[in-house]
Amino acid sequence: MRTAEAFDNIYLDLSKQPGKCKLAESGLGWRPSGGGETFTLDSNNIGAAQWSRAAKGYELKILSRSSGVIQLDGFDQEDFERLSKAFKIWYGINVENREHALRGWNWGKAEFTKAELAFNVQNRPAFEIPYSEISNTNLAGKNEVAVEFALTSDGDANAQPSGSTKNRGRKAAAGPDELVEMRFYIPGTAVKTEKGIKTENDENGEEEEEGEEQNAANLFYETLMEKAEIGDVAGDTFATFLDVLHLTPRGRFDIDMYESSFRLRGKTYDYKIQYASIKKFFLLPKNDEMHTLIVLGLDPPLRQGQTRYPFLVMQLKLDEEISLELNMTEELLESRYKDKLEPRYEEPIHQVVTKIFRGLSGKKVIMPSKDFVSHHGHSGVKCSIKANEGLLYFLDKSLIFVPKPATYVQIENIAVITMSRVGGAVSASRTFDITVTLKAGMGEHQFSNINREEQQPLEEFFKAKNIRFKNEMSDDTSALIAAALDNDDMMSSDEDGGRADRGSADEDEESVDEDFQAESESDVAEEFDSEHESSGSASDAEMDDASDAGDDEEDVDMSEEEERPKKKSKIGK
């Protein structure tokens, strides 16, 4: 037999580019045709091998002992004899010839193997999902389990060859379209035994094994969490923060901090997020002087069904202090996290969360710029994007609007900022809008209903950061004044003309009509003028509320629907 067997036009792990696969007594290797990193697998690491039909011909699936599942696609049917002979002689492994279920049924039996979840129909695999491709799983209903797949960040999609070992767990990134979620409907009950999960429908004639009967969907969910290592071992949890309010996505979550990831545990959804996915870390004080916001920029973004959340926004109380001791050995703390983490914390919760996130993720904490202070001495300016109210923060190198929709703009990408008035004369005198136009036709962002008092602080910040801006409000003011003057001239001329035409009416003596009731005029107005109430002082009161909201804002829950009437602010205890 030859010392090596080579195969051309082979695709590794759904890679875009083919490569050359070579088998030898020491192991196997794959190198992309266009050049790049070579993938190798030692012969001692090969546990089993399977041969089956696949997308580009025939596929050789290798179940390794420590590297999960390796897929080699693109073989011809004639290659099976050479492959099976090489595996038998060099690795002592029989290549199993497997046939897939082609009936198209969407019901079958799930089997948890060592490296993947298999969905079998009539004892044949319909599809398999490697555990390394599963990023998260949730109980979507009483009998329904949602499985989410790993996504590739926009910036790293082409960072490595698709067959690279550094891309392990991101096979779907090779294609322009990728499956992001799959749901399993699992009715009934089941019992977990040493041999696996035994459902109530299994009829194998064996004696019933001891085990606690529970909901089949719950047992499937817990088993998948364990196999896919979504929920890490409790002993590996460095720190836990309970019942933390999140504005985006909305809800309260427990935060478990691990070595390379953190987990959000809510009543309905659980999320596992790698620290490597954190691209930006913001610490932003709210205007109510009672809360602070911690904002994490994520890439790839967090997913909840069809909704994507590129920013994670949590809200913490400034006066809430906690005492926390890290669940970490002194050796690990000294060797890996020296000068990054402390063994014990006893200070406000927002500082503890920030310090631990910074120590474990290694990300720099970004805070509001010292070059901007609002008219009322705050770091954020109250405004809105369409119907969503929030706070706009001015940082040294960027702008960010939170909580919903969280919007991030880098200053270096800003072409010009336009300050303008929108609306009638009353609203124009109290608020204004700013439109941020981006360079190279990247679009624009409009922030509305900014208090008129913030104009000067904003202009000073734009000048300090050398941001080009236009103030269109001065032109609007001149136009309003000119219109008012013209209107006064017309009214005075009308009065003169009117008195000249009255004739003998000027000689009439004015007297009080004793039968006249003052309320009758308003009654007539209400009957014939549908806008009688809205045209009076009510609009002025509403505008006063709008302009004063930034002053009196205390415990405002900004993630609620803005269409609802504003509630009275709460006073912290």
Curated annotation (Swiss-Prot):
Location(s) in or outside the cell: Nucleus; Chromosome
GO MF, any single term: histone binding
Stored SMART domains: Rtt106
Broad class of the protein's primary localization: nucleus
InterPro entries per UniProt: PH-like_dom_sf, RTT106/SPT16-like_middle_dom, RTT106/SSRP1_HistChap/FACT, SSRP1-like_PH1, SSRP1/POB3, SSRP1/POB3_N, SSRP1_DD, SSRP1_sf
Gene3D superfamilies: 2.30.29.150, Pleckstrin-homology domain (PH domain)/Phosphotyrosine-binding domain (PTB) (2.30.29.30), Structure-specific recognition protein (SSRP1) (2.30.29.220)
Record's signal peptide: none
Superkingdom in the source lineage: Eukaryota
Pfam families documented for this protein: PH1_SSRP1-like, POB3_N, Rttp106-like_middle, SSrecog
Extent of Basic and acidic residues compositional bias: 496-505
Entry keyword Transport: no
Purpose of the protein: Component of the FACT complex, a general chromatin factor that acts to reorganize nucleosomes. The FACT complex is involved in multiple processes that require DNA as a template such as mRNA elongation, DNA replication and DNA repair. During transcription elongation the FACT complex acts as a histone chaperone that both destabilizes and restores nucleosomal structure.
Family indicated by similarity: Belongs to the SSRP1 family.
Additional information: In contrast to the orthologous protein in animals and plants, this protein does not contain a HMG box DNA-binding domain. This function may instead be provided by the HMG box of the associated nhp6 protein in the FACT complex of fungi.
Protein name per its UniProtKB record: FACT complex subunit pob3
Organism: Aspergillus fumigatus (strain ATCC MYA-4609 / CBS 101355 / FGSC A1100 / Af293)
Taxonomic lineage: Eukaryota, Fungi, Dikarya, Ascomycota, Pezizomycotina
